[in-house]
Amino acid sequence: MNVILVLVVLFFAGDCAKIRKIIDFLEKDAPNDIEKTPNYNEESLAVKRNKNFNPCLENPKICSNRGKCLHENGNFYCICPVTHYGKTCEHVSDQTNCEKHLCQNNSTCVSIKSLRTIVNTVLLRQIRVQRKVNGSKAALTNEELAEIDLEVNYECICQKGYFGGLCDESEADRTCQEVYCLGRGKGAINATGKCECECENQFFGDRCEQISACFDTQCDNGGICEDVVDWKTKTVTATCKCPSAIELIGGTVTGENCETLQIPSTAPKEFIPCAEGSNSTMFFKKFIANISLEYMDDISELEAIKNDYNDGKNVNGTMTDGWCRNDGKCVPEVVRVNSSRAYYIYRCECTNPLTDGYYCEYKRHDSCSLTREEVARGDRWDEKCTDSQHGACVDISGVAHCVCKPDYTGEKCEIFDPCARQPCKHGDCIPIPNTADVAFGTSRYQCLCPLSAKLNPESQACMEINEKKCAPGACGNGRCVPCESDADDLMPLCNDNDNRQGFRCLCEAGYLPPFCKVHTNPCYQNLCQNSATCHIDPKQRSYDCQCVNGTRGSLCENVDDSCDAFGNKICVHGTCINDEYFHRGFSCECDDGFEGLDCNVEIAWSSVMTNRLMKNYEFSLPLVACFVSLAILLPVIVISRRRQGRVEEAKKTSEVKTENP
């Protein structure tokens, strides 16, 4: 009513603009009351509320042993000196084996008892950079591999933002190598700190994001696939451009994919590969000797092919006899070298999946052994299954499989899952996240044991409770549980009678305690929830719960629609609204004439009218103002007109007297 009086006063004051402003103010959405809004994600809200909180200022000594404190989004981390490590630099590192350590980026070296093998990634990176400068694509030599593999008895504890066995990889390095090139090339940080991609064939762009039309097109016999753009139709098609001539022997290459090769009958037989009575050494020797010396680049490239022999023992050797090793198939083909000239040589098609190399000369012991490419890349055989601590590679019918160690799963044993081996036996296993702090040497899981089992303090597994006091059939149609419980149990299972006999029977539905042998109504002491109705199932000697609308589950324990389940019956004089923030899951919006939590309190007519006016204030307030105005103005107008009539009547009387003196 105070608002109405204010509007009336303003109306008579002639300030209609102020009335409009008040109505606009009332129409605005009420601001959210953050303090009263229930928090269902306290962790995310805490980060939002406390992201400017600086724990380093609140506790300047939070990092011990001269560690430097840095904060980020309300959290902190410590940059420790090389002599300490840990969340707050609380651990002292044993420096016994760290005199010549290779730990990078201010990481902490910690001595360990056993030797471990690591890859000197710093040296490997230097070798690759040098080879890129020299334009060499040859595999790593045995000397280089021996230099890269290191056996050390220390570990590197990395500072925040660094990774790898030597803490030499930054977050930028990892992102560049694994993500930036979209899986279509190799990324590397250049001298200016920018990530550059070396794209695979048929991919191009700064991030190898564009795909050539030649991606699915294979050109044989030295053919080169080219993208042909039709600007009218705005389409790109792949076309194979075949060699126009074949050096030394002549011949032509034709076909849509350059698949047709015609060799003239006049071609010298010593220049024909895969011929009987000849071999690789004789062929390349005569072939290269007949190439003009003005094509020295071609000669060098063909010499490299001839010497591309590496069986793991004899590196950069040559084929001494035959064309291919290990039952490889000799396949003649035209090869285009860097100068774009085409030569008719051959390649070996390996028939054994365990062999590779240009001559199929590299043969692995089994599928778990390293391929030639993996050796050149610096991979290790014990990394086939992530590392030796996660699992081991086993050859099964010529296919490599990872046999994971306890607590690890996945195709390469890369997933840490302490519950995978079911360590709790008779209970449920709950894994402890890697982010949680646990004492060194303790399990990274927790066992939740059922009533029929208890936790073994030594193995931390759930073991069956001693059932010697539970004779066979003692509990009929139920489960026998011994009354051996700890003295500090807050809710002991057994009563005095149970303790005297040494056990308690937990009966199935439809059987009465204490020994679960007397059959009764299965709905006796049923577990149906949320007003569900218990129905007997005579076939199963059990019961089913018939759920009310809005609930579900075997015991009707889940509520999907609180209004359908309960609210519509309670909000008789109102409308039920599902409200997850309300403890009972719904709230009542009352009809006119009722109020209260359940809209069960009837209110006076005057209060109803006031509520209606306030609900429709945009229309009702101006109307009320008008009615009040009319109620006040009408008497004034009537009095004014009566007064005016009296004046006019008096005036007429005066005029009559003047005319008749």
UniProtKB/Swiss-Prot annotation:
Entries under Gene3D superfamilies matching the protein: Laminin
Major localisation: cytoplasm
Function: Required for fertilization. May be required for cell adhesion and/or function as a signaling molecule.
Membrane topology (UniProt): Single-pass type I membrane protein
Keyword annotations: Cell adhesion, Cytoplasm, Disulfide bond, EGF-like domain, Fertilization, Glycoprotein, Membrane, Repeat, Signal, Transmembrane, Transmembrane helix
Signal peptide start-end: 1-16
SS bond list: 56-69, 63-78, 80-89, 214-225, 219-240, 242-258, 385-402, 393-404, 413-419, 523-534, 528-545, 547-556, 563-576, 571-588, 590-599
Gene that specifies this protein: spe-9
Biological source species: Caenorhabditis elegans
InterPro entries xref list: EGF-like_Ca-bd_dom, EGF-like_dom, Notch_Cell-Fate_Det
Domain named EGF-like: residues: 52-90, 210-259, 377-414, 519-557, 559-600
UniProt GO molecular function: calcium ion binding; signaling receptor binding
Motif (Cell attachment site): 377-379
Compartment annotation: Cytoplasm; Membrane
Residue ranges that the UniProt entry lists as topological domain Extracellular: 17-618
Name of the protein described by the UniProt record: Sperm transmembrane protein 9
Glycosylation: residue positions: 105-106, 134, 190, 279, 290, 316, 338, 549
Highest taxon in the source lineage: Eukaryota
The keyword Transmembrane helix is annotated on this UniProt entry: yes
